[in-house]
Regions:
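Early extracytoplasmic/lumenal segment of secretory-pathway proteins
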Residues: 21-93, 201
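Short beta-strand->loop
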Residues: 101-107, 133, 207, 220-237, ...
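Periplasmic-binding protein-like
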Residues: 139-150, 262-285
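C-terminal capping/gating helix-and-loop segments adjacent to ligand/active sites or protein-protein/ligand interfaces
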Residues: 269-326
Length: 326
């Protein structure tokens, strides 16, 4: 009888140990991201084969701001193990609210810059601008469309660029001048680029658009091999996107493996075509059209001293008042 009891106890302990091991060894990793996150089937399969983990379907939670705010609201019971897509304008919110286990890791970047329609300017005999500061000039009246900084991350990034470049007491006059010079404000990037921009969908009325330094890589004329647009790579806003392990994640080890994979050359090399961003690893070669027509900006505004978190809403409200001529 004693041997039987001992055997049962041993079996119970062994079973509990196995159950504990199973509980401590998750077989999947969940990712929360912004809406633009893309990972190819081949890359997904490569990660899963190397790690033994399955990537669960991505929880796409909106733009960088919406993503960050939703993760703050669910930080005690996170919706994922790893986050991708918090950018440098919302990194402070993530850190302040303690949603990240460890540090945010830069994965990619994009430069918010103005683009112009080369054909339009050549046809009209107008010299294209070399800086957004010039857009207040009368010869550019009624030619520019931007995204609303209260509804668009692209627009908000550029608002920050004007504040960083012109100062907290100087940016207002530039926007007032742009209002008086007939600037068009679109709700988001897709509306501005594909509807309002003359070279986006071909039917717009504005030959200057707030977009990205990478955009000319996607307007190459197959017949000539040349791009029909150009980026004004002067005083752009560099938007950096991060990944991080979410605090209270069910599989933090798996999350770290996925972040390491995002830094590997295969994932980095896929970023331009997949998400229209530059790899943070500068040793990774860019696609041919990117290297030729869409180099990253060498001139971007230093916004490191701006307190995005404390003043974001005030700046947005002040911008709204300016554009409504209040």
């Amino acid at each position: 009888m004693r041997r039987t009891i001992a055997a049962l106890v041993t079996l119970t302990i062994a079973t509990q140990a196995l159950a504990g091991c199973a509980a401590e060894s998750p077989t999947s990793v969940a990712i929360a991201s912004h809406d633009s996150f893309v990972i190819s089937d081949d890359l997904k399969a490569a990660f899963e084969s190397a790690s033994g983990l399955t990537i669960e379907g991505s929880s796409k939670l909106g733009d960088a701001g919406e993503l960050t705010n939703k993760l703050v609201l669910t930080k005690d019971s996170p919706v994922a193990d790893v986050v991708f897509g918090i950018d440098n304008t919302f990194a402070g919110v993530a850190i302040k609210n303690g949603i990240i286990d460890g540090e945010l890791v830069p994965i990619d970047y994009a430069d918010v810059c103005f683009n112009y329609d080369k054909t339009w300017f050549a046809t009209k005999g107008v010299t294209p601008p070399t800086s957004w500061r010039e857009l207040t000039e009368k010869k550019y009246a009624g030619l520019t469309v931007v995204e609303n900084p209260t509804t668009s991350s692209t627009g908000l990034s550029f608002l920050f660029a004007t504040i960083g470049a012109l100062g907290e007491s100087g940016w207002q006059s530039w926007w007032s001048s742009m209002r008086d010079n007939g600037i068009k404000v679109a709700a988001g990037w897709e509306d501005a680029y594909y509807i309002d921009f003359t070279a986006g969908g071909g039917k717009g009325n504005y030959p200057i658009v707030l977009s990205y330094s990478s955009s000319p890589a996607f307007t190459v004329d197959e017949a000539t091999g040349e791009t029909t647009t150009a980026s004004i790579n002067n005083e752009c806003f560099r938007q950096i996107e991060y990944a991080g392990v979410l605090k209270n994640a069910k599989n933090p080890a798996g999350a770290r493996k996925l972040i390491e994979f995002m830094l590997a050359k295969d994932f980095q090399a896929a970023l331009p075509d997949a998400m229209y961003v530059y790899p943070v690893d500068n040793s990774v070669a860019l696609p041919e059209n990117w290297a030729k027509f869409a180099p990253a900006s060498a001139s971007f505004v230093d916004v490191s001293k701006l307190d995005f978190d404390a003043k974001r809403s005030d700046w947005q409200n002040e911008w709204r008042d300016i554009m409504q001529n209040k």
